[in-house]
């Protein structure tokens, strides 16, 4: 039996795709699009999902993100390219994505609450959970982008 491909995943369980898409879209209405792009890309980097990295970097560029910031996103803590709000969100994304290998510290949460409302924190968390789910689906079924298939 051959591996289930991306289109088959969508056909075999459309409710899953719809649920993940709806959750991500709803949370993304509360959080600004440039930050959502950064989170999607950073989480995909952490999870090693080339398909998602390729897709979300292209989306970010299409929506006006600077290539310079995308180039250093994996080392965001070492640069001055990201705002305090972006840094807090990226740190939160890393903490939630890397569970259980690292504990959530009060420092990370305290930084987060200085930059985001409670509603925004819940929505950030939903974005992070959703992207992690997509990464695991894409990695599990070895999704390939058209550029990577060559």
Segments (PLM) and residue ranges:
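Hydrophobic alpha-helical segments
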Residues: 1-150
């Amino acid at each position: 039996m051959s591996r289930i491909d991306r289109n088959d995943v969508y056909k075999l369980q459309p409710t899953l795709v719809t649920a993940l898409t709806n959750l991500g879209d709803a949370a993304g209405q509360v959080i600004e699009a440039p930050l959502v792009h950064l989170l999607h890309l950073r989480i995909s980097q952490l999870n090693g999902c080339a398909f998602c990295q390729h897709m979300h970097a292209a989306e970010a560029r299409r929506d006006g993100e600077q290539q310079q910031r995308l180039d250093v996103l994996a080392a965001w803590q070492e640069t001055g390219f990201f705002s305090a709000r972006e840094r807090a969100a990226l740190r939160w994304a890393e903490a939630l994505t890397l569970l259980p290998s690292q504990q959530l510290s009060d420092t990370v949460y305290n930084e987060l609450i200085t930059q985001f409302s409670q509603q925004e924190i819940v929505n950030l968390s939903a974005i992070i959970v959703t992207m992690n789910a997509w990464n695991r689906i894409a990695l599990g079924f070895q999704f390939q982008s058209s550029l990577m298939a060559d």
